[in-house]
């Protein structure tokens, strides 16, 4: 919004508002976006926590889980609303409203946030321990993920929505046989010119998997004070750098990455996500005053997945978000092994003491803060590995 306002003022009053040219610089707007989201979160955080407490929106804790967590019963949840509102206000202020990629990320983020909000509301307010039925939740996630995937399949290769429509119609007219341009290929990191052509259906499937998978993986990771939000900040910031490089024709050519016009504007969203995340961490650090709930975790995971697809770094997201991947795999392996052994031996057995993985380490005697900080350190290292793919080829 401020970009359009600055352009209008410079156009009508160039002598008085020439200093507003600084708003055209993407890096300046990214810094301001992060600061705006951070300040909004810090200022309104206490009020949001008080309101959640007054409304008795408290976190239920499983009695058969880690016993030290029972003291957290009643801690306000659904604090992800604070994160999302901070991101929304900051992004809307500082990004170029004509950029279609930011709108796609915003729609996915708030679509998944709405799913999480309904899930949290049913759990906490309506006292339904299951929240949304898993099938219902997956249905809505799939709907949003598929809509985004179909649009992105054609938009990452074109510079405008009109050209996106033309590409789509050519694909339909070819009997669904035309391939996508090379920009839509799956990039294999650490290799100079290695990519895999996905085709339209392959791109849609991969995009759907990345968006929905990332959303659920972040949600599964959000089980300890501060555990999920800091990796989200780190991975989101790293993806912001990829967006900046991919959106710049000079840098992308030098680093042998596909140039996606308009992708650089995603840096504004990533900066807002980092600022809002750090503000939330102020209140979510041990001992947490508030939890983000599904409304925050599902939304942030969906945002990371969507950004990774747009900047063509799906594999790198898996590297940098390795903690999210391992946490999700730990749950899948635990459930699958339990069902298999119960069917074969009549009694279910477990691979881990408790899933997700962070609870396994708690059961082994690690303190909660040890698990959290060590997972942060691992994420920092993985983000450095991911960023190294910019040059190490």
Swiss-Prot record:
One of its GO terms (molecular function) is UDP-N-acetylmuramoyl-L-alanyl-D-glutamyl-meso-2,6-diaminopimelyl-D-alanyl-D-alanine:undecaprenyl-phosphate transferase activity. Pathway: Cell wall biogenesis; peptidoglycan biosynthesis. InterPro entries: Glycosyl_transferase_4 (IPR000715), PNAcMuramoyl-5peptid_Trfase (IPR003524), PNAcMuramoyl-5peptid_Trfase_CS (IPR018480). It catalyses: UDP-N-acetyl-alpha-D-muramoyl-L-alanyl-gamma-D-glutamyl-meso-2,6-diaminopimeloyl-D-alanyl-D-alanine + di-trans,octa-cis-undecaprenyl phosphate = di-trans,octa-cis-undecaprenyl diphospho-N-acetyl-alpha-D-muramoyl-L-alanyl-D-glutamyl-meso-2,6-diaminopimeloyl-D-alanyl-D-alanine + UMP. GO terms for cellular component: plasma membrane. Pfam families: Glycos_transf_4 (PF00953), MraY_sig1 (PF10555). Signal peptide: none annotated. Its EC number is 2.7.8.13. It is a multi-pass membrane protein. GO terms for biological process: cell division; cell wall organization; peptidoglycan biosynthetic process; regulation of cell shape. Its cofactor is Mg(2+). The chain crosses the membrane at residues 29-49, 75-95, 101-121, 138-158, 194-214, 226-246, 263-283, 290-310, 315-335, 370-390. Its main location: membrane. It is found in: Cell inner membrane. Keywords: Cell cycle, Cell division, Cell inner membrane, Cell membrane, Cell shape, Cell wall biogenesis/degradation, Magnesium, Membrane, Metal-binding, Peptidoglycan synthesis, Transferase, Transmembrane, Transmembrane helix. PANTHER family: PHOSPHO-N-ACETYLMURAMOYL-PENTAPEPTIDE-TRANSFERASE, PHOSPHO-N-ACETYLMURAMOYL-PENTAPEPTIDE-TRANSFERASE HOMOLOG. Catalyzes the initial step of the lipid cycle reactions in the biosynthesis of the cell wall peptidoglycan: transfers peptidoglycan precursor phospho-MurNAc-pentapeptide from UDP-MurNAc-pentapeptide onto the lipid carrier undecaprenyl phosphate, yielding undecaprenyl-pyrophosphoryl-MurNAc-pentapeptide, known as lipid I. Belongs to the glycosyltransferase 4 family. MraY subfamily. HAMAP family: MraY. This is Phospho-N-acetylmuramoyl-pentapeptide-transferase. It comes from Leptothrix cholodnii (strain ATCC 51168 / LMG 8142 / SP-6). The gene is mraY.
